[in-house]
């Protein structure tokens, strides 16, 4: 990695981070002054472990639906292609600690869920690939290490 790349995460040394963590990955200001804050919510250690797709997929559905019960500032929750985490974006919400609280409350809701929202062929592009139990296990594991979320490099 010698030259700066256009994608922020490609400039992050993935061998130096220690999951789990939540870091501000970038900000963008729109033409009318709105600010987007994108967080890297890393569940698994890069290049060492990953989330199984059915569990990740269900966790995406659950977080996308349930987080909106706690904030109107959420723009999107997007899974990473490497299956190690999610990008979570907020608009006009620059309070990192509150973002962590929204995540924690949402993941606590995941633990109480009895079904995966929109887990059907009408509302989902791969409805056969879901696991409520897997999503809940991921949420429980991440919540159990909440004291590590701010420590991106394990120092």
Curated annotation (Swiss-Prot):
Tree of life domain: Bacteria
Keyword Mitochondrion recorded: no
EC numbers for this chain: 4.4.1.21
Catalytic activity: S-(5-deoxy-D-ribos-5-yl)-L-homocysteine = (S)-4,5-dihydroxypentane-2,3-dione + L-homocysteine
Chain sites annotated for binding Fe cation: 57, 61, 124
EC class name: lyase
Keywords for the protein's UniProt record, in alphabetical order: Autoinducer synthesis, Iron, Lyase, Metal-binding, Quorum sensing
GO annotation terms (biological process): quorum sensing
Cofactor requirements of the protein: Fe cation
A GO molecular-function annotation: iron ion binding
Family: Belongs to the LuxS family.
Subunit structure: Homodimer.
Protein name: S-ribosylhomocysteine lyase
Gene for this chain: luxS
